A protein has these predicted regions:
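Rossmann-like NAD(P)(H) cofactor-binding subdomain of soluble oxidoreductases
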Residues: 57, 65-154
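Short leucine-rich amphipathic alpha-helices used at interfaces
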Residues: 17, 55-56, 62
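Generic secondary-structure boundary/loop-capping signal
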Residues: 10, 40, 45-47, 58-61, ...
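Short, intrinsically disordered or compositionally biased N-terminal tails of bacterial proteins
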Residues: 1-2, 155-156
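NAD(P)+-binding Rossmann beta1-loop-alpha1 motif at the extreme N-terminus of oxidoreductases
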Residues: 2-52
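A generic structural signal for alpha->beta connector loops
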Residues: 5, 28-30, 60, 99, ...
């Protein structure tokens, strides 16, 4: 993995995901997005527009509703509402390789919360799945915990 120019995909192009994707693309990274609906169509047709401090910039990024089209990434930023994650997680496999880092940019209690070293040492394995967040275990199965950048704060 390089620290100069990374291959990054942002999952979800709402306000948070769009801002992160635009900033990373404008900084020179190879950015793509997994999106849907009106946001996907707008980015495909017009690029990703960022209005800040009285100026507007347009970032050109690849955007698709199909993870296969985007391929394996160095970094995957998940910028979704927490309740959307269980449904989309099974579709993310094409984005994740053995060296892909996963950065959750989400609010709420993360699915991996009970697996942190401080808690996992005190809980039996069957107590470590946060069923209120990941009822079926699909998120835990799809996103390798050792590749998740946990306890993340994103400063923009």
């Amino acid at each position: 993995m390089t620290t100069e120019r990374m291959k990054i995909t942002v999952v979800g192009l709402g306000a948070v995901g769009g801002l992160i994707a635009a900033k990373l693309a404008l900084a020179g990274h190879e950015v793509s997005a997994l999106a849907r609906g009106a946001n996907l169509k707008a980015v495909q047709e017009q690029g990703l527009r960022l209005r800040m401090d009285g100026t507007e910039q347009t970032a050109t990024i690849a955007a698709s509703d199909d993870a296969h089209a985007l391929g394996t990434q160095e970094l995957m930023v998940i910028a979704l509402k927490g309740q959307a994650l269980p449904d989309i997680t099974p579709t993310l496999a094409p984005l994740i390789g053995p060296d892909t880092l996963v950065l959750p940019a989400m609010n709420g209690v993360p699915w991996w919360f009970l697996r942190t070293p401080a808690l996992s040492q005190r809980l039996a394995p069957e107590q470590q799945q946060l069923t209120s967040v990941d009822p079926s275990g699909a998120i835990d199965q799809a996103l390798p915990l050792q590749q998740v950048l946990g306890l993340s704060l994103i400063h923009i």
